[in-house]
Amino acid sequence: MLRSEKPVAVEDIVNIYKESPSVIITHYHGLTVSQVSSLREALKSKEVGFKVVKNTLAKIAAKHTGLDSITDLFAGPSAIVYSKEPVEMARLVVNFANSNDNLKIIGGIVDNHILDTYAIKELAKLPSLHELRGKIVGLLQAPATKVVGVLQATSSSIARVIHAHAIKH
């Protein structure tokens, strides 16, 4: 990389750190080009980015954005995975890492909280924001459905009682 290109590369990484509340740092040593391509495609389909970075430039960008605590994570062949949706991103990376030993999850940051490998794997087990919203809507609708059922049962019971009384008389 030319010296004149380095400030542009740092600025690009700074923008990723600023715009993405979730970043996972990985080591990709041993991945083939086709494996990296398939990882990129899987991530891109879910609006998750993947960028191979030079460690020194990633550290400089981290310092520019106040993320000094993640600079120690950059050693070896590093790539960052970034997204606005941390759970889906973690799930994709963990699944790929589980099926391919050459991708190592080093750590990450979610909403300015440093995560280790274990925390990222636990994050991947959580339901996504979209799934949580669906569950909440379901929970909110359930009481209304039950109330309607009770009201309908009551009105039909009253109708049966009136009908039975009318038949008797």
Swiss-Prot record:
Keyword Zinc-finger among UniProt keywords: no
Top-level taxonomic group? Bacteria
Q: Which GO terms describe its molecular function?
A: large ribosomal subunit rRNA binding; structural constituent of ribosome
Recorded hits in PROSITE patterns, A to Z, give:
RIBOSOMAL_L10 (PS01109)
| UniProt key word RNA-binding | yes
| Entries under Pfam families matching the protein | Ribosomal_L10
- Keywords, in A-Z order: Ribonucleoprotein, Ribosomal protein, RNA-binding, rRNA-binding
Q: Where is the signal peptide?
A: none
Instruction: Kindly give the Gene3D superfamilies that the UniProt entry links to this protein.
Output: 3.30.70.1730, 6.10.250.290
GO CC list: large ribosomal subunit
Q: What is this protein called?
A: Large ribosomal subunit protein uL10
What is the primary gene name for this protein?
A: rplJ
